[in-house]
Amino acid sequence: MDAARRTQAERAAETREALIAAARPLFAAHGFADAALETIVRAAGVTRGALYHHFADKTDLFAAVFEQVEGEVAARMGEAIAASNQTDPMEVMRLGADYWLDACSDPEVQRIALVDAPAVLGWTRWTEIGNRYNIGMVRALLTTAVETGRIPSQPIEATALTILGAMREVTLYVARAEDHNQARHEAGAVINRLIRALSAD
């Protein structure tokens, strides 16, 4: 019985992953509004009923895709930071910000995470999902920076939320800009100045 349940659970997980995998390129290429559920279930090789077994609606499926994108970008950012061998918390934060801005220039990330997600999910849910993958690292870096005297003592949570709020706004700025390269350059310069300013007396 346990083996049968595990097999059933595995099949359910595979179906869910198939739906996310099918929906992701369609959301990226056509946007949320124009990605039809019939096209998604056909690409996933499942029925419409199977979709509704795993997701309440199209918005719920989109949220799962967005969360996958956020998780992958955060994981790759962590790998890039680890590969840099940088240990200074403020430099790590700067590297992370630069990586995030570069990642958000990717058309798939841009369309799903920056163009559609705020409109489809609403500001509150969009920021909650985004913070889930980033705020822990920012808190840890700020805490280390304070403990090592790298920056003056300051409220960690308020500072972390301020940094993430600024990052959200500049990534939206880059996504909506006509000249993405210029906007990326401007955004990087502003965020780097913001991070450097934390260490000022």
Where are these regions (language model features)?
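Basic, helix-initiating cap at the start of DNA-binding domains
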Residues: 1-30, 34-46, 59-63
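Hydrophobic alpha-helical connector segments
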Residues: 64, 78-108, 159-163
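Alpha-helical DNA-contacting segments of helix-turn-helix folds
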Residues: 63-69
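Short hydrophobic/aromatic patch on the recognition helix
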Residues: 45-55
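Amphipathic alpha-helical packing segments from all-alpha helical-bundle domains
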Residues: 71-78, 102-103, 123-148, 157-161, ...
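Amphipathic C-terminal alpha-helical segment
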Residues: 102-106, 135, 139-140, 144, ...
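Secondary-structure edge/capping motif, primarily at the C-terminal ends of alpha-helices
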Residues: 80-84, 111-114, 174-178
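Amphipathic alpha-helical segments used for helix-helix packing
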Residues: 104-124, 172
